[in-house]
Amino acid sequence: MKDNERRILLGRVVGGFGLRGEIKMESWTEPRDAIFRYQPWLLRSPTGTESMLNGARGYDTGKRLIATFPGINDRNAVEAICGTEIYVPRSALPPPHPDEYYWVDLEGLQVHTLEGVVLGSVSHLFSNGANDVVVIHGERERLIPFVQPDYVKSVDFEAERIVVDWDPEF
């Protein structure tokens, strides 16, 4: 597996909510309010300034994630941190369940067909609502449903490879 101490982007401050320093956040954890379990956070401002934060609290309204940060008590303070990204070390995340993967761990792996044709490497993944989709950059970009065992036959972190049942012409 890759370096456990690399930083993983979990979310971002997107704006203020009300006048008392509440913060609208974007979270890429699942469920999205799980981001509060992985503290302390490394905050990185849009200008590149970094700081540590512990003690953030929040809740999911169903439409958005709302948070409070220690020391942020009014809307002006929130506006000053808009765009700030929230990171944690990879080691802060619990081990995934068998046959489940963190997307970040799949990024960079080479993708091979059953016949041994190299399609490229994993750029990123996204969810289309029905399933996750792996985006592969190679001779051209390919999008393959990350569905086991239909399309994804194996993931081998030691060999840094994913094997898929996919027509290389498609």
Swiss-Prot record:
Gene Ontology molecular-function annotations: ribosome binding
SUPFAM superfamilies: PRC-barrel domain, Translation proteins
Gene3D superfamilies: PRC-barrel domain (2.30.30.240), RimM (2.40.30.60)
Keyword rRNA processing: yes
GO cellular component, one term: ribosome
UniProt keyword annotations, A-Z: Chaperone, Cytoplasm, Ribosome biogenesis, rRNA processing
InterPro entries: PRC_barrel-like_sf, PRC_RimM, RimM, RimM_N, RimM_N_sf, Transl_B-barrel_sf
Single GO BP term: rRNA processing
Main location: cytoplasm
Subcellular location: Cytoplasm
All residue ranges annotated as the PRC barrel domain in the record: 97-170
Family the entry assigns: Belongs to the RimM family.
Summary of subunit composition and partner proteins: Binds ribosomal protein uS19.
Domain notes: The PRC barrel domain binds ribosomal protein uS19.
Function as written in the Swiss-Prot or TrEMBL entry: An accessory protein needed during the final step in the assembly of 30S ribosomal subunit, possibly for assembly of the head region. Essential for efficient processing of 16S rRNA. May be needed both before and after RbfA during the maturation of 16S rRNA. It has affinity for free ribosomal 30S subunits but not for 70S ribosomes.
Protein name (database record): Ribosome maturation factor RimM
Protein species of origin: Xylella fastidiosa (strain M12)
Encoding gene, per UniProt annotation: rimM
